[in-house]
């Protein structure tokens, strides 16, 4: 079976078992800052397992795209060198949220794997593990399914602590957890390795293909396991692994999904060895990089973009090892789209964008190699001893993308070595950070848990009545909040908008007779709206009725800005292109901030075009229309989804100007575009590689901004004794006068340096056929001394020059050696000695070097080193 057929068969099997087929979620986890990338099928259902979210179904099945790069499940450096490590993979899964449990999950797995209608794997090839004390699962396997005891393995706590086992899964130190049962395929005695639990289990003979996790306990901070009222099931089967089994190969790189990618990679690079580990690296990395970019990640120096950049550069480095010349990586995207574009349409839709991002990053990598060389030169100039420290090697590798083997080559040329152990310690520290980032990072038992949903009244107005259904103080549920206490109030219905989609939460107050609660912010937990604030008067009790009043002026100002972001988004796609994707936003009552994907600064004429388009839509004063519909219908209408937002089965579609702007949005907006009044961009800049940010104001704030700019123009005109009408002419004349004076100053400096050079050259002494000049020139900076050394080298011919001086209490040193002497004498070595004499450091090229220090009293001694340096070197 082909991989695509296996994927479809799995999903169809579980649909027939009453499961809802759910699309793969984005690789960027929605509203979950604790997780770097989606790395398991259960990630999108996390809130369902935690009891924070209720869905219309209790059974689900997915084929989830996953990335594991550097986290606890994967080491990036292993990819390409083992049969099964990948940065990107598909996880097939079936899930039960308080519906079926162990018996059904086990029978489903066995039926799909061994049923003649499905995968039809030989039963005698399958081994099963269970947690050591999970007698229930063991009995189901042996007594009901019929797996013989000799192919059953109980796995205990094999990781040094209670419940620390390959067969016990936990969401964190506390919270949902439970035993798991894993199914292994035996590739046969021709492959080395032993069954699970044996000393040889790390071999390739017995391969895990399916894991069923049974979440049946809630572990509290004291380590006690409490049975969950509604146990759940989370399963995962790697598509690549099961494809290898069904296609009778022992390496994932031999399956159909990879064969065309390996061929395309070899063609793009121009190499013939299609079994080289480096080629497998490239074929693997094009998948993770392309899917990450399609889901909105762009290369940068932090967070998700940083991981993407590392993967791209690793692919480029391995391509270069195979002989690639110029950019090649982006050329493989077409083959990936042909292989996986039908299953994941976002690849087809984003193909041009993905190729452009990869090509730009490849070109940038070539430049960073040059930057890395410069940084290495600086570090070598300060090096004491013959070993380059591990932290320096790691900095070059991690920050500048500088290959470790290249650092090693340079070190060898200079008779140096690198601290490999220190580098590995830095790498392990990074892996620990990645492992930490892959955990959920929260105490399940400290979460504010609210059953049910809050009915939102805010689309109809800014006030309404509600009943208190829950109160919280310091995250703990309470029956009452007293005057002066801070806490959270949950109502059965509310006009307060809860922060989401970039729009801040509403503020205002809740009141009843003799009671007032000042609402400072409103957030959401599951479907409940949480009103954060303080009891200003009286006390609040669960069950009490209150009147909820939103600050209308703040709500209206926020609505202007939110509606303007929709118009701006549409205008950006018109002016810059369809590759523009929203990367984030902040909308409050003061301004709007909109982050989006684009690869260069926006030109002034483009900014003007954006303002013109948005303001034209405002002047059209069209009605802002909303419609409740299902997600598929909304997408069919071309509605754009908000970056990082989770949507239910029913969504709210917001349209402006007919089809000018159509987006999914649950925020609060104006009634007509004319309500916005005026739109003015206040700034545009870059916030990360490939991500730009526009900030703008609307309505009264836009008018105030323009009035302020007018006042600044008047003040500037007054400073140059002009008016608004002739301000540009006045400024132009002033700048021209300044340039003229700067030119005169440079000419005077050049004359002074030339005169000084004539005087100094006469002071040079001859040592073994070389002119040696050491001189003190106080008050000159490094730039002036460099120019003077260049001039003296031309005047003296075969020469060694060391100039130094005191400037602002510090020592400045410059050394120069003419090219005909650099084979015997190096300026960098002379500088190291001279700088050390004044308590500093220095270094540079063989023909020119700079340095400095703090001990000006030793400057004359440092300059005297020049003659001894030449005498010893020649």
UniProtKB/Swiss-Prot annotation:
Q: What class of enzyme is it?
A: ligase
Q: Which SMART domains match?
A: tRNA_SAD
- Where, subcellularly, is it found? Cytoplasm
Q: Does the keyword Zinc-finger apply?
A: no
Protein name per UniProt: Alanine--tRNA ligase
Q: Which GO terms describe its molecular function?
A: alanine-tRNA ligase activity; aminoacyl-tRNA deacylase activity; ATP binding; tRNA binding; zinc ion binding
Q: Which GO terms describe its biological process?
A: alanyl-tRNA aminoacylation; negative regulation of DNA-templated transcription
Instruction: Indicate the family of this protein.
Output: Belongs to the class-II aminoacyl-tRNA synthetase family.
Gene (name only): alaS
Functional note: Catalyzes the attachment of alanine to tRNA(Ala) in a two-step reaction: alanine is first activated by ATP to form Ala-AMP and then transferred to the acceptor end of tRNA(Ala). Also edits incorrectly charged Ser-tRNA(Ala) and Gly-tRNA(Ala) via its editing domain.
Q: Which reaction does it catalyse?
A: tRNA(Ala) + L-alanine + ATP = L-alanyl-tRNA(Ala) + AMP + diphosphate
- State the UniProt keywords alphabetically: Aminoacyl-tRNA synthetase, ATP-binding, Cytoplasm, Ligase, Metal-binding, Nucleotide-binding, Protein biosynthesis, RNA-binding, tRNA-binding, Zinc
Residues binding Zn(2+), per UniProt? 562, 566, 665, 669
**Enzyme Commission designation:** 6.1.1.7
Signal peptide start-end: none
Q: Which InterPro entries match?
A: aa-tRNA-synth_II/BPL/LPL, Ala-tRNA-lgiase_IIc, Ala-tRNA-ligase_IIc_anticod-bd, Ala-tRNA-synth_IIc_core, Ala-tRNA-synth_IIc_N, Ala-tRNA_ligase, Ala_tRNA_ligase_euk/bac, DHHA1_dom
Cofactor, how bound (note): Binds 1 zinc ion per subunit.
Q: Does the keyword RNA-binding apply?
A: yes
Q: CDD domains, per this entry?
A: AlaRS_core (cd00673)
Which superkingdom is the protein from? Bacteria
Q: What is known of its domains?
A: Consists of three domains; the N-terminal catalytic domain, the editing domain and the C-terminal C-Ala domain. The editing domain removes incorrectly charged amino acids, while the C-Ala domain, along with tRNA(Ala), serves as a bridge to cooperatively bring together the editing and aminoacylation centers thus stimulating deacylation of misacylated tRNAs.
What Gene Ontology cellular component terms go with this record? Answer: cytosol
Organism, by scientific name, is Pseudomonas paraeruginosa (strain DSM 24068 / PA7)
Q: Which cofactor does it need?
A: Zn(2+)
Q: List the disulfide bonds.
A: none
């Amino acid at each position: 079976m082909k991989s695509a057929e296996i994927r479809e068969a799995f999903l169809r099997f579980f649909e027939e078992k009453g499961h809802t087929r759910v699309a793969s979620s984005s690789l960027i986890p929605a509203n979950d800052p604790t997780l770097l990338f989606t790395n398991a099928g259960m990630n999108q259902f996390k809130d369902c397992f935690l009891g924070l979210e209720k869905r219309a179904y209790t059974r689900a099945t997915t084929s989830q795209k996953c990335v594991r790069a550097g986290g606890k499940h994967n080491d990036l450096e292993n990819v390409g060198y083992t049969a099964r490590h990948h940065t990107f993979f598909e996880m097939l899964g079936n899930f039960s949220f308080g519906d079926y449990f162990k018996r059904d999950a086990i029978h489903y797995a066995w039926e799909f794997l061994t049923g003649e209608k499905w995968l039809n794997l030989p039963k005698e090839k399958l081994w099963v593990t269970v947690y050591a004390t999970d007698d229930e699962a063991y009995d189901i396997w042996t007594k009901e399914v019929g797996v013989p005891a000799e192919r059953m393995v109980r796995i205990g706590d094999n990781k040094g602590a209670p419940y620390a086992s390959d067969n016990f899964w936990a969401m964190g130190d506390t919270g949902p957890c439970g035993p798991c049962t894993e199914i292994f395929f035996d590739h046969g005695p021709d492959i080395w390795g032993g069954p699970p639990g044996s000393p040889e289990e790390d071999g390739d003979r017995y391969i895990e293909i399916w894991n069923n996790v049974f979440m049946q306990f809630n572990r509290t901070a004291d380590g006690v396991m409490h049975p969950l009222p509604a146990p759940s099931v989370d399963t995962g089967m790697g598509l690549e692994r099961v494809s290898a089994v069904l296609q009778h190969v022992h390496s994932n790189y031999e399956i159909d999904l990879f064969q065309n990618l390996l061929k395309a990679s070899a063609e793009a690079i121009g190499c013939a060895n299609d079994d080289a580990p480096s080629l497998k690296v490239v074929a693997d990395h094009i998948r993770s990089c392309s899917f990450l970019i399609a889901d909105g990640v762009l290369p940068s120096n932090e967070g998700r973009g940083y991981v993407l950049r590392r993967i791209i550069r690793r692919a480029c480095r391995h391509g270069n090892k195979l002989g690639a010349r110029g950019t090649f990586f982006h050329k493989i995207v077409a083959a990936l789209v042909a292989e996986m574009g039908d299953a994941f349409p976002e690849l087809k839709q984003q193909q041009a964008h993905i190729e452009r991002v990869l090509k730009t990053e490849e070109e940038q990598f070539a430049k960073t190699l040059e930057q890395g060389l410069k940084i290495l030169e600086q570090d070598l100039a300060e090096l004491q001893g013959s070993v380059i420290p591990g932290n320096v090697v790691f900095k070059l590798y991690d920050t500048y993308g500088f290959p470790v083997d290249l650092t090693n080559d340079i070190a060898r040329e200079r008779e140096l070595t690198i601290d490999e152990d220190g580098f590995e310690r830095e790498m392990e520290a990074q892996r620990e950070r990645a492992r930490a980032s892959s955990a959920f990072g929260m105490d399940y038992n400290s979460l504010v848990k609210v059953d049910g949903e809050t009915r939102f009244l805010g689309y109809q107005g800014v006030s309404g009545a509600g009943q208190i259904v829950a109160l919280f103080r310091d995250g703990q549920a309470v029956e009452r909040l007293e005057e002066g206490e801070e806490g959270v109030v949950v109502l059965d219905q509310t006009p307060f908008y809860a922060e989401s989609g970039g729009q801040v939460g509403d503020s205002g107050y809740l009141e009843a007779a003799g009671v007032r609660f000042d609402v400072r912010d409103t957030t959401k937990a599951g479907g409940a709206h949480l009103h954060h604030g303080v009891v200003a008067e009286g006390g609040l009790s669960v069950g009490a009725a209150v009147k909820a009043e939103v600050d209308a002026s703040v709500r209206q100002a926020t609505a202007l800005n939110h509606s303007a972001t929709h118009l701006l988004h549409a205008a950006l796609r018109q002016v810059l292109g369809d590759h523009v994707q929203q990367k984030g936003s902040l909308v409050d009552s003061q301004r709007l901030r909109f982050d989006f994907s684009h690869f260069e600064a926006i030109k002034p004429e483009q900014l003007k075009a954006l303002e013109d388009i948005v303001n034209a839509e405002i002047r059209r004063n069209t009605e802002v229309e909303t419609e409740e519909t299902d997600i598929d219908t909304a997408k069919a209408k071309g509605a754009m989804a908000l970056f990082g937002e989770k949507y239910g089965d029913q969504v709210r579609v917001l349209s402006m100007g007919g089809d000018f702007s159509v987006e999914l949005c649950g925020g609060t907006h104006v009634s007509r575009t004319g309500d916005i009044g005026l739109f003015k961009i206040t700034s545009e800049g870059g916030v990360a590689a490939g991500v730009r940010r526009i900030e703008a104001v609307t309505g009264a704030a836009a008018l105030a901004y323009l009035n302020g700019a007018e006042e600044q123009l008047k003040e500037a005109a007054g400073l140059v004794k002009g008016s608004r009408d002739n301000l540009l002419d006045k400024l132009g004349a002033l700048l021209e006068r300044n340039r003229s004076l700067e030119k005169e100053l440079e000419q005077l400096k050049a004359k002074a340096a030339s005169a000084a050079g004539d005087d100094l050259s006469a002071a040079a002494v001859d040592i073994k056929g070389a002119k040696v000049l050491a001189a003190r020139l106080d008050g000159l900076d490094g730039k002036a001394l460099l120019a003077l050394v260049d001039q003296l080298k031309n005047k003296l011919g075969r020469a060694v020059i060391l100039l130094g001086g005191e400037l602002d209490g510090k020592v400045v040193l410059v050394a120069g050696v003419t090219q005909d002497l650099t084979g015997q004498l190096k300026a960098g070595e002379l500088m190291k000695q001279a700088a050390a004499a004044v308590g500093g450091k220095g270094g540079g090229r063989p023909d020119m070097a700079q340095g400095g220090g703090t001990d000006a009293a030793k400057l004359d001694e440092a300059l005297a080193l020049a003659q001894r340096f030449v005498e010893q070197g020649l």
